[in-house]
């Protein structure tokens, strides 16, 4: 009986080890290799693996996705929540938003933001968007490896939204959660 229990435990440990084996992920958009040269002269490749703590499979997004966009931290996000000159936009898809978001955020998915610039103070005209009355937008998605908000911000700028009115919270929900800050279910 003891042998049977030992064999079962050994097999379950082996299965568990295989199931949590890390998946290699890109660090940045292209397949670039980063190498650190140690004091001994040994070269050590820097890798990124999908582990239980690495929640997203994307790749690191630049701190400033486009020239003119202002990067912000949690402090600026907290200050923007009740500031009438700002709108906090969760640029993730509706399923992510409905699960949890930052209090006070509205959901404009990254795939829709260019069609909904009127909600951000722009006027639709025959020649395109007039964004002279645009509000300040704090945009975020799932975190440093999430491409959704940078994609949305590029589309906003392409369609006439002023880059200097876009504030990018690159840390997104990953950092917000890691810091233990309050979240709410998204309200449509």
Label every PLM stretch briefly.
Residues 179-188:
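Active-site neighborhoods of enzymes that stabilize oxyanions during catalysis
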Residues 92-95, 101, 112, 141-143, ...:
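A mature extracytoplasmic/lumenal domain signature
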Residues 121-176:
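Catalytic cysteine-centered active loop of the rhodanese-like fold, especially the PTP/DSP P-loop
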Residues 70-136:
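Mid-length scaffold segments of soluble, non-membrane domains
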Residues 6-15:
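Bacterial N-terminal signal peptides
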Residues 17-99:
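Flexible, polar/low-complexity N-terminal or interdomain linker segments that lie immediately upstream
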Residues 1-4:
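Positively charged n-region of N-terminal signal peptides that target proteins for export
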């Amino acid at each position: 009986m003891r042998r049977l229990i030992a064999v079962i435990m050994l097999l379950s440990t082996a299965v568990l080890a295989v199931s949590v084996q890390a998946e290699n992920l890109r660090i940045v958009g292209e397949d670039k290799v980063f190498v650190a040269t140690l004091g001994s002269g040994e070269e050590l490749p820097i890798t990124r693996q999908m582990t239980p703590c690495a929640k997203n499979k994307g790749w690191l997004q630049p701190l400033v996705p486009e020239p003119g966009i202002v990067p912000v931290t949690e402090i600026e996000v907290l200050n923007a929540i009740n500031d009438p000159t700002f709108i906090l936009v969760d640029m993730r898809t509706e399923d992510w938003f409905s699960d949890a978001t930052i209090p006070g955020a509205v959901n404009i998915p990254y795939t829709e933001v260019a069609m909904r610039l009127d909600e951000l103070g722009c006027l639709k005209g025959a020649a395109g968007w007039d964004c002279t009355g645009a509000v300040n937008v704090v945009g975020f998605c799932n975190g440093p490896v999430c491409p959704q908000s940078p994609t949305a911000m590029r589309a906003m700028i392409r369609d006439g939204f002023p880059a200097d009115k876009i504030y990018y919270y690159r840390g997104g929900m990953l950092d917000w959660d890691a810091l233990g800050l309050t979240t709410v279910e998204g309200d449509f």
